[in-house]
UniProtKB/Swiss-Prot annotation:
The lineage of its organism: Bacteria, Pseudomonadati, Pseudomonadota, Betaproteobacteria, Burkholderiales. InterPro entries: DXP_reductoisomerase, DXP_reductoisomerase_C, DXP_reductoisomerase_N, DXPR_C, DXPR_C_sf, NAD(P)-bd_dom_sf. The keyword Nuclease does not apply. 1-deoxy-D-xylulose 5-phosphate binds at K128, S154, E155, S187, H210, S223, N228, K229, E232. The keyword Manganese applies. This is 1-deoxy-D-xylulose 5-phosphate reductoisomerase. Mn(2+) binds at D153, E155, E232.
Length: 399
C-alpha cells in the first residue's frame, strides 16, 4: 500500500497493540494512528492516545468512558470517545482509516475484524477467532470487497512470506500451485517435557510462563495446551485454502524458525527470525516493502543448534481436538473456540484444574456433534452458536 496510512489499532493495550504502536512510531511520515480501542486499561489507553494523537478511542461501556475521561490530561482536547461493540465495528469500517490492526483477543474481536474486511481495508489479522469461528464468512468478505488480508500471527506471516503471493494479499480459493504442505512450528510451551500426570496441579502462573514470547495470559495458556497451535492450523486452512491433511505441526523449542512451506520438488522454505512480533507487524504494515522494525539481527552461530520434534498428542490433547474440529466443519470449530474460552477463563480464575481444559472442549465437541446441523451463513448465526456453546460449557459443572 503506497501513501500515508491511517491506522485503527483494535486491542491497542495488549502485547500486539504495544508492538504495533512501536513500529508505527518509527515511521511518522508513513503511518498515523486514527483510532485505538481497549477493554479495561483506560489509563494505558489514555496514555497511548496522548502519545499518538489518535482522533478516536473506542471503549466497551459508559463506565469505561468515564474512567478514560478521568485519566485524560486536562491540557489536551479529548479524542472522540465511542462506546460499545457496534461502535467498534463501525470504527473498523470508518472511512477515516485505511488499515485495521485486528488484535482483540477472543470472539469479541470477530465483528470488528469482519467489518474491516467487508469495507475493503488492509486488514492486519491477529485475531484468530475471525477465521476459526467464521472462516468462510470472513474470506468471502475479503474476496467481495477487495480487502487486503495480511496475517500477523508469526506462523502464518512466515508461511505468507514463503509462498509465491506476488504483490497482492487476498483470499485464495485454492492452494498455491506446487505447494505440498504447510508446516507450523510451536515452541511446545512451558510443559513440553511434562508427563500428563505432572500437569494435574499446574497453576495459572506456571501456564503463563512462556519460554520465548511475551503474550497475554489467555493466549499464554492456549500456548501451554497447544490449543493455540490448533487454532492456527484452522487459520492456515482458511488463509491458504489448504486441507487439514496438508498442514503439519512441529515442535521447535527455540522459536527461531517460525514456519515452513514444502514444495513438490522437495524444497522446503523456512522463515526465520527473532521471536519478536514487531517483525510480522512491520511486514504487514509495509507490504510489499520490508521495514526496519527495530528487531535485532538473528545470530545463528550464537544459537548453535535448532531442534524439532513431533508433538505428543497425549500431552497435548487440545491439538488433536483442533484437527478433529477442522475436519468436522465450521460448527465444530465454533464449539472448540467457545468452550476453550470458557475453560481457560475458569482455569485462570482458579475454578478449573488445568487438565480439565481439554475435557471441557471435548465435551462441547461431543455435544455439538449430537445436535442437528446448523447453517452458519451470517455473523449472527456464528454468534448465536457461540453463545449456546458457552452456556453449555459453563453449565457442565466443570467451568
Amino acid at each position: 500500500m503506497s501513501g500515508f496510512q491511517r491506522i485503527a489499532v483494535l486491542g491497542s493495550t495488549g502485547s500486539i497493540g504495544d508492538s504495533t504502536l512501536d513500529v508505527i512510531a518509527r515511521y511518522p511520515e508513513r503511518f498515523g494512528v486514527y483510532a485505538l480501542s481497549a477493554f479495561s486499561r483506560m489509563d494505558k489507553l489514555a496514555a497511548q492516545a496522548l502519545a499518538t494523537g489518535a482522533a478516536v478511542v473506542v471503549v466497551p461501556d459508559n463506565n469505561a468512558a468515564t474512567r478514560f475521561r478521568q485519566a485524560w490530561s486536562p491540557s489536551r482536547a479529548l479524542p472522540e470517545i465511542r462506546v460499545g461493540a457496534q461502535a467498534l465495528a463501525d470504527t473498523a469500517a470508518d472511512a477515516g482509516c485505511d488499515t485495521v490492526m485486528a488484535a482483540i483477543v477472543g470472539i469479541a474481536g470477530l465483528p470488528a475484524a469482519l467489518a474491516a474486511a467487508q469495507s475493503g481495508k488492509r486488514v492486519l489479522l491477529a485475531n484468530k477467532e475471525a477465521l476459526v469461528a467464521a472462516g468462510s464468512i470472513f474470506m468471502s468478505a475479503v474476496r467481495q470487497s477487495g480487502a487486503e488480508l495480511l496475517p500477523i500471527d508469526s506462523e502464518h506471516n512466515a508461511i505468507f512470506q514463503c509462498l509465491p503471493q506476488g504483490e497482492r494479499a487476498g483470499a485464495p480459493s485454492t492452494p498455491a500451485k506446487t505447494v505440498r504442505k504447510l508446516i507450523l512450528t510451536a515452541s511446545g510451551g512451558p510443559f513440553r517435557r511434562h508427563s500428563p500426570e505432572d500437569l494435574q496441579d499446574v497453576t495459572p502462573d506456571q501456564a503463563c510462563a512462556h519460554p520465548n514470547w511475551s503474550m497475554g495470559r489467555k493466549i499464554s495458556v492456549d500456548s501451554a495446551t497447544m490449543l493455540n497451535k490448533g487454532l492456527e492450523v484452522i487459520e492456515a486452512h482458511w488463509l491458504f485454502a489448504m486441507p487439514a491433511d496438508r498442514i503439519e505441526v512441529l515442535i521447535h523449542p527455540q522459536s527461531v524458525v517460525h514456519s515452513l512451506v514444502e514444495y513438490d520438488d522437495g524444497s522446503v522454505l523456512a522463515q526465520m527470525g527473532q521471536p519478536d512480533m514487531r517483525t510480522p507487524i512491520s511486514y504487514g504494515l509495509g507490504f510489499p516493502e520490508r521495514l526496519d522494525a527495530g528487531v535485532s539481527p538473528l545470530d545463528l552461530a550464537k544459537w548453535g543448534r535448532l531442534d524439532f520434534e513431533t508433538p505428543d498428542l497425549e500431552r497435548f490433547p487440545c491439538l488433536r481436538l483442533s484437527y478433529e474440529a477442522l475436519r468436522a466443519g465450521q460448527a465444530a470449530c465454533v464449539a472448540l473456540n467457545a468452550a476453550n474460552e470458557i475453560a481457560v477463563a475458569a482455569f485462570l480464575e482458579g475454578r478449573l484444574p488445568y487438565p480439565w481444559i481439554a475435557r471441557v472442549i471435548d465435551a462441547a465437541l461431543e455435544w455439538q456433534a449430537g445436535r442437528p446441523s446448523v447453517t452458519l451463513d451470517h455473523l449472527t448465526d456464528v454468534l448465536a452458536l457461540d453463545a449456546q456453546v458457552r452456556a453449555y460449557a459453563g453449565n457442565l459443572g466443570l467451568a
